[in-house]
Design a protein with these regions (language model features):
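Carbohydrate transferase catalytic cores enriched for Leloir-type hexosyltransferases
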Residues: 1-392
Length: 392
């Protein structure tokens, strides 16, 4: 059987890119010579990166025919009568693909009329927190709903990264529970490339950061809660005369200017450092020099940075409503309360508290690894079942 992995993210998307790359490498390992695995990407710059990782790669582009098939998707009987296939599906069929694996949610799944597919759901936060502009504005909510309602019922398998997310998928979209597999993510495999003394020295030379800062690697979206962290720093400075430094690393999706304005308004110019998007090789050094990873984000139920922090022995400050992800491996706070976050920041300065959280992080990472390996056994079995049915 030949499986196609569809990878349409570029490196600037951050966590989504790393999760997708992990998923591709995982699938290749699970195929283990039994099945052939080929990656298809719309981003030409991904080709050398994927090839260097040992993956077979094909580059494709979206065509006007794909758009026409998508628009006609509301009239499936007409499509059947016209016998129109998208250029996307034609390319896959031309490569003798048997099964398509979407490592990210994708409208392209709705273009497939003959080929079966595995679909990945990263989150359902447009339903959990519809009040944020990145979900509410410009039709983002409607677009996500359209994709999920059209693609999920026809998927031979749906991958979610937690049992919490699996339950929400089943409840909200009416798919059968046995067709949804909860399989935890793993830390970015690219993180290891910067976990060495040479990378540490290079990163320090580039960024010139103080020791013991609070680290928040996140794109600048409203739901990421950067401003809540600034408010907490103001409270700490007011109550104890000083506050720790904070380092933001991530690309801008429209909210950075507001965060920068708040830094000036709060008088935190000397305490907050904006690094922008940083290369993968600098992430581990930035984690290693941090006092803690702080994530005042609303979206979940899981996130990638906690896995990275646990793998590098960095303590985690995490929202209470995401406790299902981190278990005992975080110090929690109310994401709607600057006072609560300030209290957590104050507590994490205690070495005993830090060591407790770090030790729990090691345990949590092992627990998630065991869950992932169990899910991989199920996934391999599902691939074998599909292969047997597909060849009939």
């Amino acid at each position: 059987m030949i499986i196609a992995g569809i990878f349409t993210q570029d490196v600037s998307t951050g966590g989504g890119y790393h999760q997708g790359l992990n998923a591709l490498l995982q699938m290749q390992a699970l195929c283990n010579g039994k099945h052939e695995f080929i990656v298809f990407t719309t981003v030409p710059a991904n080709e050398p990166i994927l090839a260097q990782a040992g993956l077979k790669v094909r580059v494709f582009r979206t065509t006007l025919r794909d758009l026409a098939v998508f628009l006609l998707g509301s009239f499936p009987l007409l499509l059947m009568r016209l016998r129109w296939l998208s250029s996307f599906e034609k390319k896959l069929l031309g490569e003798n693909i048997d099964l398509v694996y979407f490592v990210h949610p994708s409208l392209r799944a709705t273009l497939l009329q003959r080929l079966n597919y595995i679909f990945t759901v990263m989150d359902l936060c447009h339903r959990d927190f519809p009040e944020f502009p990145e979900v509410r504005n410009t039709g983002a909510f409607e677009c996500r709903e359209q994709v999920y309602r059209a693609a999920l019922p026809k998927a031979v398998l749906i991958l979610a990264d937690s049992s919490e997310l699996k339950e929400r998928i089943v409840r909200r979209y009416g798919v059968e529970a046995e067709r949804v597999l909860a399989m935890p993510f793993q830390p970015s495999l690219l993180l290891k490339s910067g976990d060495n003394e040479a990378a540490m020295a290079e990163a320090q030379s580039v960024y010139q950061l103080p020791e013991g800062y609070l680290f928040y690697p996140a794109q600048f979206w409203s739901h990421k809660g950067h401003i809540r962290l600034l408010e907490a720093l103001v409270l700490l400075r007011r109550n104890q005369g000083d506050c720790p430094s904070c380092v933001f690393a991530g690309g801008d999706h429209g909210n950075r200017r507001l965060v920068e304005q708040k830094v000036v308004e709060f008088g935190l110019q000397g305490r907050v450092h904006f690094l922008g998007f940083v290369p993968s090789g600098h992430l581990a050094p930035l984690y290693r020099r941090a006092q803690a990873l702080v994530m005042p984000t609303y979206f979940g139920p899981t996130n990638l940075p906690p896995l990275e922090a646990w793998s590098l022995d960095v303590p985690l400050l995490y929202p209470e409503h995401l406790r299902g992800h981190a278990g005992d491996a975080a110090l929690y706070f109310d994401v709607d309360s600057a006072e609560s976050l300030a209290g957590a920041i104050k507590k994490i300065a205690d070495p005993i508290c830090r060591e407790r959280i770090v030790a729990a992080g090691r345990v949590r990472l092992k627990e998630l690894s065991a869950e992932r390996m169990s899910a991989e056994v199920v996934l391999v079995r599902q691939l074998d079942v599909f292969c047997g049915r597909h060849m009939m």
